[in-house]
């Protein structure tokens, strides 16, 4: 499987089969697994004439980098968008633009969780710096539960410069910082927005911070001083979604 990427887990593989079936070369299932969730996968694979085989679970354990749920797919290399594609993504997106920029999130579990939350909140693209980010690997895909197959991940050479270009296009850049004067709930986030989240502990880099139009913090009522970056991202994104959702 060395020349192919591997994707594992029911949700991640199902998302691939539904959204990018041409990328899937082979579907492997653990011997003896015939439950309804696997039946859905085999039916999808059959519809696209994708071979389905069985392997001993211990062999799948060696292939996968984590809990595979008895499902592993061999796929062609994943697409990471370049910064020149941001304009196209914004042009074809519907509604008020909402982008997420992750400055220095290097843990694949955090990146996967952020992708999952971003998709749920309606984010059009997630932006990461090429040299300060986890890569789109099998662990990220598994944690993202299918979101990595549908939400564009844009890797940029210079995050500060990219934020400046987005500002010129009319987007407001909102960065998160624990020492900010205002809380996130005091900002009007209904307009075109880029939400910037920094790395745990270090926060945003200096140049990234300098390119933010606003800085905001999450109010903390307990004894801990901060949240996990993926949890904080979820809180921030769903506050933006709340502000943009009309009351019925």
Swiss-Prot record:
Coiled-coil spans in chain: none
Residues reported to bind S-adenosyl-L-methionine: 198, 218, 227
Catalysis: reaction(s): guanosine(2251) in 23S rRNA + S-adenosyl-L-methionine = 2'-O-methylguanosine(2251) in 23S rRNA + S-adenosyl-L-homocysteine + H(+)
Keywords for this protein: Cytoplasm, Methyltransferase, rRNA processing, S-adenosyl-L-methionine, Transferase
Tagged with keyword Metal-binding: no
Subcellular compartments: Cytoplasm
EC number: 2.1.1.185
GO MF terms held by the record: RNA binding; rRNA (guanosine-2'-O-)-methyltransferase activity
SUPFAM superfamilies per the UniProt record, alphabetical: alpha/beta knot, L30e-like
First and last residue of the signal peptide: none
Membrane-crossing segments per the record: none
InterPro entries: 23S_rRNA_MeTrfase_RlmB, Alpha/beta_knot_MTases, Ribosomal_eL30-like_sf, rRNA_MeTrfase_TrmH, SpoU_MeTrfase, SpoU_subst-bd, tRNA_m1G_MTases_N
Enzyme class: transferase
Ligase in keyword set: no
GO cellular component: cytosol
Gene3D superfamilies cross-referenced by the UniProt entry: 3.30.1330.30, 3.40.1280.10
NCBIfam families xrefs: PRK11181.1, rRNA_methyl_3
Family classification: Belongs to the class IV-like SAM-binding methyltransferase superfamily. RNA methyltransferase TrmH family. RlmB subfamily.
PANTHER family in the cross-refs: 23S RRNA (GUANOSINE-2'-O-)-METHYLTRANSFERASE RLMB
Function: Specifically methylates the ribose of guanosine 2251 in 23S rRNA.
Name of protein: 23S rRNA (guanosine-2'-O-)-methyltransferase RlmB
Record organism: Pseudomonas aeruginosa (strain ATCC 15692 / DSM 22644 / CIP 104116 / JCM 14847 / LMG 12228 / 1C / PRS 101 / PAO1)
């Amino acid at each position: 499987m060395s020349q192919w990427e591997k994707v594992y887990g029911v949700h991640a593989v199902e998302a691939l089969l539904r959204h990018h079936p041409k990328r899937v070369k082979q579907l492997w299932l653990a011997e003896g697994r015939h439950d309804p969730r696997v039946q859905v996968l085999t039916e999808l694979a059959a519809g696209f004439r994708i071979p389905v085989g069985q392997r001993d679970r211990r062999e799948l354990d060696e292939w996968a980098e984590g809990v595979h749920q008895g499902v592993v797919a061999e796929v062609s290399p994943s697409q990471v968008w370049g910064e020149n594609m941001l304009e196209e993504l914004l042009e074809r997106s519907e509604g008020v633009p909402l982008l997420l920029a992750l400055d220095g999130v290097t843990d694949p579990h955090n990146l996967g969780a952020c992708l999952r939350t971003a998709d749920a909140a309606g984010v059009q693209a997630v932006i990461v710096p090429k040299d300060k980010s986890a890569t789109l690997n099998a662990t990220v895909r598994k944690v993202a539960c299918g979101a990595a197959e549908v939400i564009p991940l844009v890797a940029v050479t210079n995050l500060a410069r990219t934020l400046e270009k987005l500002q010129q296009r009319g987007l407001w850049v909102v960065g998160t910082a624990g020492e900010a004067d205002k809380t996130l709930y005091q900002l009007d986030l209904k307009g075109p927005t880029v939400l910037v989240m920094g790395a745990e502990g270090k926060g945003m880099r200096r140049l990234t911070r300098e390119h933010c139009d606003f800085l905001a913090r999450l109010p903390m009522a307990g004894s801990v001083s901060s949240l996990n970056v993926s949890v904080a991202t979820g809180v921030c994104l769903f506050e933006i979604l709340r502000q943009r959702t009309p009351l019925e």
